[in-house]
Swiss-Prot record:
The keyword Mitochondrion does not apply. Keywords: Ribonucleoprotein, Ribosomal protein. Belongs to the bacterial ribosomal protein bL12 family. One of its GO terms (molecular function) is mRNA binding. The gene is rplL. This is Large ribosomal subunit protein bL12. Forms part of the ribosomal stalk which helps the ribosome interact with GTP-bound translation factors. Is thus essential for accurate translation. The keyword Ribonucleoprotein applies. Homodimer. Part of the ribosomal stalk of the 50S ribosomal subunit. Forms a multimeric L10(L12)X complex, where L10 forms an elongated spine to which 2 to 4 L12 dimers bind in a sequential fashion. Binds GTP-bound translation factors. GO terms for cellular component: cytosolic large ribosomal subunit. Pfam families: Ribosomal_L12, Ribosomal_L12_N. NCBIfam families: L12 (TIGR00855).
């Protein structure tokens, strides 16, 4: 069997079959499929920067309300579908996460809307 044939066979397997294959390989060869954790080398900063670029989920943090609290509350209500009291409590509790684990596009849109209302926003 060639490598290409093995790859084709593996591609056709279900997740359960792949899991069983990994377990069988671990048992047969006495190895572990766990990822080894190593300390970053001198280029660790570059690796950290690359990992930061690959981030897919972001949190929109309300840092400061600014002078126009009412507009910020309205913007929070539109973005989160919260009631008036919940949105007011969130705004008054700043710094506070307004949206969590959202896409880059959604985080940018939320930041734009909240900054237009007068708030200071941070995306993490």
């Amino acid at each position: 069997m060639t490598i290409d044939e093995m790859m084709s066979a593996i591609k056709g397997m279900t997740v359960i079959e792949l899991s069983e294959l990994v377990k069988a390989l671990e048992k047969e060869f006495g190895v572990s499929a766990a990822v080894a954790v190593a300390a970053p080398a001198a280029g660790g900063a570059a690796v950290a920067a690359a990992a930061e670029e690959e981030k897919t989920e972001f949190n929109v943090i309300l840092k400061d309300v600014g002078a126009n609290k009412i507009n910020v509350i309205k913007a929070v209500r539109e973005l989160t579908s919260l009631g008036l009291k919940e949105a007011k409590d969130m705004v008054e509790a700043a710094p506070k996460a307004v949206k969590e684990n959202v896409s880059k596009e959604e985080a940018d849109a939320a930041k734009k809307a909240l900054e237009a209302a007068g708030a200071t926003i941070e995306i993490k």
